[in-house]
Regions:
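Structural motif
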Residues: 7-9, 49-52, 77-81, 125, ...
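Short hydrophobic/aromatic-rich motifs at helix boundaries and adjacent loops
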Residues: 9-13, 40, 96, 122-123
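Thiamine diphosphate
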Residues: 13-89
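Conserved thiamine diphosphate
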Residues: 48, 96-140
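Active-site-proximal loop->helix
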Residues: 65-70, 90-104
Length: 140
């Protein structure tokens, strides 16, 4: 596509850092959960660049929920790619905010029980209701 020179990726700590090995673009490593805030600043400073985040569920749906919702609410001109595997994948497969009901993890060996653990956080459905959000899609 020839857009490598015009693209900046923001990836936080965790599984997302592996993306550096596969895409030959400029990358910024963000503090855990802060990728949308960093991406917002980078885009405002470089309005002609394509800026995106690449985040796992521990980063986006746990520690970074506020940054994600507020970036969407402000209508920031960034793309957020959310890799949701339903667990904290890099630290041993623990239950994450997105772990599905009944899903077995290393910290809930009998499956997620909503009476004990609450409901899974449905990020796509949450941000699609935010007025500043432009486009939401779920892929598998």
């Amino acid at each position: 596509m020839g857009i490598e020179e015009e693209t900046i990726g923001i990836a936080p700590v965790g599984c997302a850092v592996f993306a550096y090995n596969y895409l030959d673009i400029d990358w910024i490593e963000a503090a855990h959960g802060r990728a949308p805030a960093i991406a917002s600043a980078v885009k405002r400073l470089n309005p002609k660049k394509m800026v995106f985040t690449y985040q796992g569920d521990g980063d986006l749906a746990a520690i970074g929920t506020a940054e994600t919702i507020h970036a969407c609410n402000r209508g920031e001109n960034i793309a957020i790619i959310f890799i949701n595997n339903g667990i904290y994948g890099m630290t041993g497969g623990q239950m994450a905010p997105t772990t599905l009901e009944g899903m077995v993890t290393s910290t809930c060996p009998y499956g997620r029980n909503v009476a004990l653990n609450g409901y899974p956080l449905r990020i796509a459905e949450l941000v699609e209701r935010v007025d500043g959000t432009c486009y939401v899609t779920r892929q598998s």
